[in-house]
Amino acid sequence: ENQVGLHYQIHRGIGVHHRAAMDRNESLQVAITVGGSPAMSLAAVMPLPEGLTELTFAGALSGRRVRMIRGSHAPVYADADFAIVGRVDPTATMPEGPFGDHLGYYSLQRPFPFMKVEHVWHRKDAIWPFTVVGRPPQEDTTFGQLIPELTDPIIPTVIPGVKAVH
């Protein structure tokens, strides 16, 4: 009860923070937010280099700092339509999957961490955005096409010597 399974890449983003909390044998405070500005949605799906946060990228895209709400919980994105806040135990897992992917294959069921939900907030008239995922072309294909348009111009400045990525 009051749990949310978390399925993420253990070597990136939240996985790095979770590993650090595990090494300290501490629970990890997490805020899952849904909705808000298009810049935040785009930042969430971008393959950003380590060290460049989604918040920084979204702020750069929108031309202003991302507003956050701070309290006794993890910081929460102020413009989100929904926020689910809780803690991830350093060692507890639950089965997640199988999941279908956009090529028509399924991943295996595996143990993943889960969050014990402490708070759920939502805006009045909130909207839960989603995309239809499946064999291309689907809605998620648009994100895949947009990413190179945004990243191709900056590749040479981020990776010296590389002129293009195909």
Regions flagged by a language model, labelled:
Residues 2-45:
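Internal alpha/beta scaffold segment
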Residues 36-166:
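Charged, compositionally biased interaction regions
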